[in-house]
């Protein structure tokens, strides 16, 4: 729970409804920054004004420029905060997680569904994973033990367990993770299995013959089925790499990613740009907080195409060897760009940074830095 003056962290037992206070911060913290950027509500600005004696109804929301600070944020998207651990860089370190903080950074992923947001976030942490599924095979001698004792690889252990045939109830019993989240993760696993019904024959993406014989013996709906599967996968946060691996692309996987990208672009399966407006589109907003999603039909912003924009790529999640000093380089680049009269555009997904503050640039994309992502943007 957080407000503009303090932030508290609780450990909660859903069965007994018992709880313990883990931490209290009498100040704005990293979690406050995340809450502010996730909702588009300027917590620090409002807190400062309240301290000076203003009322919420007196303050204009400086992000939306439409509503007052008294207007409660309404969200039509999902935000996932995922920590980054660098435990592998320390010899002999205990990788079991508890109430003590071991992460060195974090990312903020945004999508229209939980599935989309969590898969984006798992790529954003930059530790070699492509999402919840289609990663390198994890060697886990005892899945039950790995589920009971959380480590930095726990979510990938859950993926391994689902692939091995564990049910949602079994994983819930071992992890105590709420079934709602496990069901969403199972949805991703199910979509991965459905993608395995596709294959490439003579350079064309099609259904496997045994699937075609049962689902569409006449072959009339084959193209529609393939396109629906791809669209569903993209709406659940699957990258082109994941899709290529799931359909069994043979050869270099970078070429596989490009093949999938070329196919879906020809099929019109493209992302759209949406605003983080705190209003769920209830009122017009002028916010420059933006994200990409495949669950939409139109962009919320219009591009001038005047070639007057310069894009700055952020440094992503903090890690051992890369921290605030690299982000400050990005901030100085943005300041110089604006001073020279150009439109400044930042692509970053680290909620801790100054570069992801709403007033640092003309447009801020809270999105993944990858070939299939930035190339869709024309500032």
Region spans (language model):
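Glycine/threonine-rich flexible loop motifs
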Residues: 319-329
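ATP-dependent carboxylate activation and anion-phosphoryl transfer catalytic cores
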Residues: 2-194, 229, 233-237, 255, ...
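Conserved small/polar residues in nucleotide/adenosyl-binding loops
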Residues: 1-8, 200, 207, 225, ...
């Amino acid at each position: 729970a957080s407000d503009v003056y303090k932030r508290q962290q609780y450990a909660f037992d859903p069965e007994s409804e018992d709880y313990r206070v883990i931490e209290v911060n009498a100040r704005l913290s990293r979690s406050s920054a995340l809450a502010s950027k996730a909702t588009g509500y300027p917590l620090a600005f409002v807190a400062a004004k309240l301290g000076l004696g203003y009322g919420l109804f007196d303050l204009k929301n400086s992000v939306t420029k439409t509503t007052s600070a008294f207007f409660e944020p309404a969200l039509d998207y999902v935000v996932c905060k995922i920590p980054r651990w660098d435990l592998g860089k320390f010899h002999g370190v205990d990788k079991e997680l508890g109430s003590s903080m071991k992460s060195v950074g974090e990312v903020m992923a945004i999508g229209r569904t939980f599935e989309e947001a969590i898969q984006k976030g798992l790529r954003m942490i930059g530790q070699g994973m492509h999402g919840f599924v289609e990663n390198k095979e994890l060697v886990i001698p005892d899945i039950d033990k790995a589920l009971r004792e959380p480590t930095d690889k726990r979510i990938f252990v859950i993926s391994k367990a689902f692939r091995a045939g564990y049910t949602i109830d079994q994983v819930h019993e071992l992890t105590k993770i709420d079934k709602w989240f496990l069901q969403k993760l199972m949805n991703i696993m199910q979509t991965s299995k459905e993608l395995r019904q596709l294959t490439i024959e003579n350079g064309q993406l099609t259904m496997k013959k045994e699937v075609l014989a049962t689902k569409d013996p006449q072959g009339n709906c084959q193209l529609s089925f393939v396109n629906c599967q791809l669209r569903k996968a993209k709406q659940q946060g699957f990258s082109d790499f994941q899709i290529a691996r799931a359909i069994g692309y043979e050869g270099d996987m970078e070429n596989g990613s490009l093949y999938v990208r070329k196919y879906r672009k020809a099929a019109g399966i493209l992302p759209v740009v949406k605003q983080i407006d705190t209003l769920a589109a209830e009122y017009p907003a002028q916010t420059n907080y933006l994200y990409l999603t495949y669950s939409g039909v139109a962009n919320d912003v219009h591009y001038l195409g005047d070639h007057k924009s310069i894009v700055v790529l952020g440094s992503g999640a903090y890690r051992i060897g890369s921290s605030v000093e690299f982000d400050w380089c990005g901030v100085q680049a943005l300041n110089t760009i604006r001073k020279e009269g150009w439109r400044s555009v930042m692509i970053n997904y680290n909620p801790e940074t100054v570069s992801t503050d709403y007033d640092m640039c003309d447009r801020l994309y809270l999105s993944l830095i990858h070939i299939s992502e930035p190339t869709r943007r024309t500032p």
